[in-house]
């Protein structure tokens, strides 16, 4: 018996997709315009996870130049077939839908095989039928004309894995459960007991988000929806419920025939979901040929008992992240913006340190500014970074930041100066700077920049080399215009 604590992946881990190979489970998530892209996770009990790499970890795989932070890589699907792992996903501004492959989920993963204009839409998925054929399951705008925002449909076409192209124009199979529903997306196809099951998200990633399902005896026929659709949603629980926006699920079974679903949801704080969409887990039972998610409960729970033996991992994902720069490569958990300039940092110039060279690009621009970031996993947290920064020019800056996008972030930075350095706290909101606090710094050498957050409020501190806490710099509200990251 193992106990999964929800969310099983805390913080910015949206659009989960999962597959099982023997006793091992592998899961991936969207990464948008961050580099590297598509984190890959491994588990043996669905409760404890470790990150084993990033599928898109080379610049040749991941063109993101100029992308908004919420664009980039959307909704990957991971599948396994005859010794090969497949991930299909969308780079919304650079090439569209593509497939990458690997013999080991740790990588290396191949360069993208772009599927071209024929594979339109977003959130593609792959399905391997019993005869070995591979099918592309996608979304696209209503070909008869889009009547309203989100008027899309789900379609299927066979995929030639050797040529990496679709074999035909595709067959529309469903438009979602509700009449005139918006954004039928995130499709996943399964086969069970002679039926093909198509599970999708609909309602948009917001208060109306949900999971719906349909089935058919043939892939080329219209799918009939479950009469209980949507089969899962939190839309009826109200905006103040601790977990909202539940949807976009992917099913998986265990070796004993038990079923589960992973999905995204968000935990709001003071009306904002500023840590993004997270990955949750629920149990599934089949009744009358249809899946029932968390039967007898009907909503996501804080803990889920699983009929799988507990299996602990050496590098389990936890709520506490500690990064020591004593390795030869950057930690898989660290993210950069759009790309990572290998000449702009070093782990060997000073042993035990990450040396970050100054760049002209700014965090206020949609560029690859100098940035290494960790996902925020909770609303109550502390974060600190030890830093040496002895620049003398006034336009040279370094520090820490709570980053949501180029237009909205909160930073504490050391600014260079000919005589004395300054420490500033700046709120950059809707592309405008507000100086919240400014202090002169007399201390030299190593400084520890320290942030303590509680809910949507944060207090900043600075410690010198002797551990002395300098004057608190600012106490401020963290709530910025919310985007669903």
Each model region followed by its residue ranges:
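Blade-edge beta-strand/turn elements of extracellular beta-propeller
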Residues: 2-8, 49-64, 100-118, 158-182, ...
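Carbohydrate-binding surfaces in secreted/extracellular proteins
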Residues: 385, 449-474
């Amino acid at each position: 018996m193992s106990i999964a604590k929800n969310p099983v992946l805390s913080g910015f881990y949206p659009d989960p997709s999962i597959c099982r190979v023997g006793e091992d489970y592998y899961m991936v998530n969207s990464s948008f315009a961050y580099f590297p892209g598509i984190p890959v996770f491994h588990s043996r009990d669905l409760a404890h996870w470790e990150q084993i790499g990033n599928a898109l970890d080379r610049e040749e795989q991941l063109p993101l130049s100029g992308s908004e932070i919420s664009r980039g890589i959307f909704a990957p699907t991971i599948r396994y077939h005859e010794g090969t792992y497949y991930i299909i996903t969308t780079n919304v501004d650079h090439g569209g839908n593509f497939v990458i492959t690997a013999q080991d989920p740790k990588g290396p993963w191949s360069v993208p095989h772009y599927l071209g204009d024929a594979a339109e839409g977003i959130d593609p998925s792959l399905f391997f039928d019993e005869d070995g054929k591979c099918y592309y399951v996608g979304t696209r705008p209503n070909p008869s004309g889009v009547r309203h925002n989100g008027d899309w449909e789900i379609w299927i076409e066979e995929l030639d894995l050797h040529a990496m192209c679709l074999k035909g124009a595709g067959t529309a199979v469903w438009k979602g459960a509700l009449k005139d529903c918006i954004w039928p997306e995130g499709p996943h196809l399964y086969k069970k007991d002679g039926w093909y099951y198509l599970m999708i998200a609909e309602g948009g990633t917001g208060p109306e988000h949900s999971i719906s399902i349909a089935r058919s005896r043939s892939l080329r026929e219209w799918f009939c929806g479950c009469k209980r659709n949507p089969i899962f949603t939190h839309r009826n629980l109200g905006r103040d419920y601790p977990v909202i926006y539940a949807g976009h699920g992917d099913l998986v079974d265990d070796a004993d025939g038990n079923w589960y679903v992973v999905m995204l949801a968000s935990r709001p704080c003071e009306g904002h979901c500023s840590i993004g969409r997270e990955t949750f887990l629920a149990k599934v039972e089949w009744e009358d040929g249809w899946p029932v998610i968390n039967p007898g409960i009907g909503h996501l729970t804080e803990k889920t008992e699983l009929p799988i033996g507990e299996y602990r991992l050496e590098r389990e994902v936890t709520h506490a992240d500690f990064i020591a720069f004593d390795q030869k490569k950057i930690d898989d958990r660290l993210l950069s913006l759009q790309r990572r300039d290998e000449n702009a940092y070093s782990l060997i110039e000073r042993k035990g340190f990450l040396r970050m060279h100054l760049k002209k690009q700014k965090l206020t621009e949609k560029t690859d500014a100098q940035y290494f970031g960790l996902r925020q996993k909770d609303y109550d947290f502390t974060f600190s970074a030890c830093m040496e920064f002895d620049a003398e020019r006034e336009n040279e800056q370094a520090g820490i930041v709570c980053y949501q996008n180029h237009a909205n972030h909160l930073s504490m930075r050391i600014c260079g100066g000919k005589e004395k350095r300054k420490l500033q706290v700046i709120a950059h909101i809707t592309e405008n700077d507000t100086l919240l606090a400014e202090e002169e710094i007399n201390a030299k050498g190593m400084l520890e920049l320290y942030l303590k957050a509680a809910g949507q409020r944060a207090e900043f501190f600075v410690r010198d080399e002797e551990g002395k806490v300098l004057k608190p710099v600012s106490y401020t509200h963290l709530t910025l215009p919310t985007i669903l990251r």
